[in-house]
Design a protein with these regions (language model features):
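N-terminal interaction/assembly modules
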Residues: 1-106, 157
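Residue-level marker of positions within ordered structural domains that often coincide
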Residues: 29, 120, 145
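Short amphipathic alpha helix immediately N-terminal
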Residues: 104-125
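Helix-turn-helix DNA-binding module
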Residues: 121-138
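DNA major-groove recognition helices of helix-turn-helix
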Residues: 140-154
Length: 158
């Protein structure tokens, strides 16, 4: 499913992928919060509301599901993991892991961080300001484009 390495990503696809990468931290925080909420409720159905600035939770009656607590939690976790946001999180994590493939671990770590910073803000962090010793400019941008291409392919954008 991966596109050939010599193909450039279309501009609109590249922009979509950059926004996926830039939203990664926020989406991951939201995912972890949702996951903890599901796990902490123990499968109980509840409604959360705010009264006078104080958050309260009211548990809803579930007589027909009382014995299926674990199943309810598993179902809700599976539904959460099937969302587009979680697919994007996983795609970014997998692509980020493979940024430095074939390089010594120290250089791979530096490259991974440099590509990440460049994707977050390319104007603030161009190659010249990232000081990745041992890597040429063309190699850096090729690796960054492979990172973006892998995410695009996994998300079905290209």
């Amino acid at each position: 499913m991966n596109p050939p390495n010599n193909d450039k990503l279309p501009w609109d696809v590249r922009q979509q992928v950059l926004w996926i990468v830039r939203g990664y931290e926020r989406q991951k925080r939201e995912y972890l919060r949702s996951r903890m909420e599901i796990l902490s409720t123990g499968g109980d159905r509840s409604a959360t509301y705010t009264v006078n600035g104080e958050e309260r939770r009211e548990y809803l009656p579930t007589a027909h599901n009382a014995s299926r607590t674990t199943e309810n939690v598993a179902t809700r976790l599976a539904a959460l993991d099937a969302t587009t946001a979680v697919r994007q999180i996983r795609a970014v994590e997998r692509a980020r892991y493979h940024i430095g493939d074939g390089l010594p671990s120290e250089l791979a770590d530096k490259l991974r961080e440099a590509v990440w910073m460049n994707c977050m803000d390319g104007r603030k962090y161009p190659f010249e300001r990232l000081y990745v010793v041992g890597l040429e400019r063309t190699t850096f941008y090729r690796r960054r484009n492979e990172f973006l291409r892998q995410i695009a392919a996994e998300m079905g954008l290209f």
